[in-house]
Amino acid sequence: MSEAEARPTNFIRQIIDEDLASGKHTTVHTRFPPEPNGYLHIGHAKSICLNFGIAQDYKGQCNLRFDDTNPVKEDIEYVDSIKNDVEWLGFHWSGNVRYSSDYFDQLHAYAIELINKGLAYVDELTPEQIREYRGTLTQPGKNSPYRDRSVEENLALFEKMRTGGFEEGKACLRAKIDMASPFIVMRDPVLYRIKFAEHHQTGNKWCIYPMYDFTHCISDALEGITHSLCTLEFQDNRRLYDWVLDNITIPVHPRQYEFSRLNLEYTVMSKRKLNLLVTDKHVEGWDDPRMPTISGLRRRGYTAASIREFCKRIGVTKQDNTIEMASLESCIREDLNENAPRAMAVIDPVKLVIENYQGEGEMVTMPNHPNKPEMGSRQVPFSGEIWIDRADFREEANKQYKRLVLGKEVRLRNAYVIKAERVEKDAEGNITTIFCTYDADTLSKDPADGRKVKGVIHWVSAAHALPVEIRLYDRLFSVPNPGAADDFLSVINPESLVIKQGFAEPSLKDAVAGKAFQFEREGYFCLDSRHSTAEKPVFNRTVGLRDTWAKVGE
């Protein structure tokens, strides 16, 4: 199979193939242009994988450009986190990081060119009046009384805006297009507004800032972008994108192409709503493992490879759709099943005493991965007192229950066969200790008399156990589409985080943040980067061993 045949295919790649075949372009140059006013989420990951992936596959270039035209909402903290997320996902931008603010002088010059051509004017309507004059989807707008100012007056007023002669909201520069256009975006859109705010890149040099629609297309052209890819909500904006480039003196005219944005069940992607979750402390920050942010997914234990695989599987189309959470979870589950070393941890512990076990203990050998001998093995301490999970024992049970039952046998993982003899309870009737006997000749082998022991449970030696906090994360919302609720905060899942105190095998004291483990029979977990200490490790559940979403949907 050739390199071209091995590539994923979608309508954007078909356009690129046609452009290259026809000679319209000889190379491919894309860009990823986030606004640095928040943390990237899984939806941005789709755009990152698309833009950087195309550049990678076609041996072209992809720029990282920050659309930093609103100093009030932006911060260098977001710039740094976005760069980190792009690199963590496995991509590298072409050349230096770029900023729309790099082009403020050129953008200002192009605004003056539009004024000189009679295609832009300074408007002194209030923001409320501008909205009122704009009209509706069914009614045309009406012209501003300031629309027919002379070129000379507009130039003077625009210079007054630039030098701080107007208060915020008292004047703006608008394109002179058509107030009766069926497309509201073309009804004399604002090109520049006044903001007396310090900019994280340009300081206090400017008090006028260009709008996204004016900045974006010119930045693309100045950088030689061949294919400007954005989500479907910018479809109507393409008309303004083309209008600006058609009416200024610039040699390059990129084309904009739209694809569907990523919608994921049981979460929200709106930056405003995500910000509300953080500021109202429904979550502990932008990197909370329940958040759909890349930093939250990373802290939860998602790998870059699993997110790239997810973006590959959902594909690129023009149809908006909502992706099931199971699709995302299956990608990380497959990745970790293949690559995560195994370990034992008991999440809901109950003491088990082996009454006929002699000696202080021994070491048993366990494979780090059942199907990958190259991952080696480890020595795990075993003793006569162990912790098992409370759910792995019943005093009475039917034949379907394959774990430990009073009077019956079960195998301890990679250790011995044990038999439950009796229990001890507290005053409330809760089991505090299970007393067992063991068959000393069954260390990692079947009983000599041929009897069959079907169940296998995991365990941790009590004398060697590492106390751990285990955070069981679940979906953040209790309904598939929380954004459709009258109050999305009212459908937050109260069980989205359950904290347990358990015990783990001592090898996990060497765990590092970002490396996942399969806790045998429990799920996939990783060390929490924020709350863990050497004395008390904290592990986050990344995903369960099986798909729990099928049941949720029933």
From Swiss-Prot:
Q: What is its EC number?
A: 6.1.1.18
Listed A to Z, the keywords are: Aminoacyl-tRNA synthetase, ATP-binding, Cytoplasm, Ligase, Nucleotide-binding, Protein biosynthesis
Q: Which Gene3D superfamilies match?
A: Glutamyl-trna Synthetase, Domain 2, Glutamyl-tRNA Synthetase, Domain 3, HUPs, Ribosomal Protein L25, Chain P
Location of the region described as Interaction with tRNA in the Swiss-Prot/TrEMBL record: 317-324
The record ties this protein, via PROSITE patterns, to:
AA_TRNA_LIGASE_I
**Which residues hold ATP?**
35-37, 41-47, 231, 261-262, 269-271
Recorded catalytic activity of this chain's protein = tRNA(Gln) + L-glutamine + ATP = L-glutaminyl-tRNA(Gln) + AMP + diphosphate
Which family is it part of? Belongs to the class-I aminoacyl-tRNA synthetase family.
Assembly, per entry: Monomer.
What is this protein called in UniProt? Glutamine--tRNA ligase
Give the originating organism.
Escherichia coli O6:H1 (strain CFT073 / ATCC 700928 / UPEC)
